[in-house]
Regions:
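Amphipathic, oligomerization/interface secondary-structure segments
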Residues: 136-328, 344-351
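Charged, non-catalytic interaction/linker regions at domain boundaries
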Residues: 1-163, 323-347
Length: 351
């Protein structure tokens, strides 16, 4: 069916994005577009969409399945992703165009802010402009990135560590499920771990964060013994624990395992493997593998916390009278996860 109906959407922001010094435009597909494309025009403080459709719509913003609605959301995610400042949306105007006449859709007068902010927020992590092409592409990868960034952006504006962690984990979850393409969660996590290690050179800023940890900080800022007891709770899990140990070689990880494995010493000894494990740890006492520390914290440890948190096994993180070591733990993990997701997307290395 021919696209006979013209629409124009104008989104105005309260503040200018200093990184967008001039207008640029893209031709963007939409679902079931059959080769038709919309024009996205990005400017420092605005987005303009020019669209053609095969019917006249009475409602757009209130219909999440409407292709114009999805294009609006797509453009806003792209705009915020390449912004060095998160600004409120000042206005949204949707016009139906017939000849030289513009008829405004009244529903666009009222809308909610996708990012719930009352004042502009400076953002130090902004994606390169070229990534907009990936964000707006109508493909499995494009959809994955948009979903991930919708959560990642929410995490950037919250002061609540636990809300931040939830959003960051959901963003990371979407990326590793897309990459792993398996129904099993652990399989997908194993696949993204291998991918990150194989592409270590793409994660310099994430590695910089983990490399800044002093030995005692790494040992005592995280609950390693609780992780070991939780993930390997009985004798029958001992071989899995041994396999876990052998996946790592970095000297810092060897050091913390030497200190924390005592909680499962009897189980390991029952298999006659204690001396072998000690020899393995000692043989790697001078080995460096920076990316392993990233995967240990962002995948193994964060997944342990995620399960405790999402399954309601621990108190709500904010139900307390003063800040404690668990808050500091989430603070560190949020910083790490945020950077890992940023580098995964910004370097455009996912296939």
């Amino acid at each position: 069916m021919a696209s006979n109906y013209n629409y124009e959407v104008r989104i105005q922001f309260k503040e200018k994005n200093p990184l967008l010094t001039e207008k640029f435009q893209l031709m963007v597909d939409y679902k079931k577009s059959k080769g038709n494309q919309d024009r996205f025009i990005f400017a420092p403080s605005s987005i303009v969409l020019k669209l053609k459709r095969s019917r006249k719509y009475k409602s757009i913003l209130s219909n999440p399945q409407n292709s114009i609605n999805t294009q609006i959301i797509k453009s806003i995610i792209a705009y915020y992703s390449v912004s060095s400042i998160y600004s409120q949306i000042k206005s949204i105007q949707i016009n139906y165009i017939e000849g030289k006449n513009k008829t405004p859709l009244l529903e666009s007068v009222t809308f909610q802010q996708p990012l719930q902010i009352s004042i502009p927020i400076q953002n130090n992590l902004y994606f390169k402009k070229e990534i907009i092409q990936e964000i707006t592409t109508e493909s499995e990868k494009g959809e994955c990135i948009r979903i991930a960034l919708s959560y990642w952006l929410k995490a950037q504006i919250t002061d609540d560590l636990y809300v931040g962690f939830e959003n960051l984990w959901r963003a990371f979850n979407r990326l590793y499920v897309y990459y792993g393409k398996q129904s099993n969660e652990n399989t997908n996590l194993c696949e993204i771990r291998k991918f990150i290690i194989a592409n270590a050179h793409h994660f310099p800023q994430t590695i910089k964060i983990t490399n800044s940890y002093l030995e005692q900080e790494l040992l005592h800022s995280f609950r390693w013994q609780k992780l070991i007891l939780n993930d390997y709770p009985t004798q029958k899990h001992t071989q899995a624990l041994i396999d876990f140990i052998h996946r790592y070689t970095d000297k810092r990880i060897m050091k913390l395992l030497q200190e924390k494995l005592v909680c499962r010493e009897d189980n390991i000894k029952s298999l006659g493997k204690w001396n072998d494990i000690q020899n393995y740890l000692n043989s790697n006492k001078n080995t460096s593998s920076d990316i392993e520390l990233v995967t240990l914290l962002c995948i193994k440890y964060a997944y342990f916390l995620r399960n405790k948190f999402f399954h309601g096994e621990i108190l709500n993180g904010t139900f307390k009278l003063t800040k404690d070591h668990i808050d500091l733990e989430f603070e560190k993990l949020n910083k790490l996860l945020s950077m890992l997701i940023f580098e995964l997307v910004n370097n455009n290395i996912l296939p």
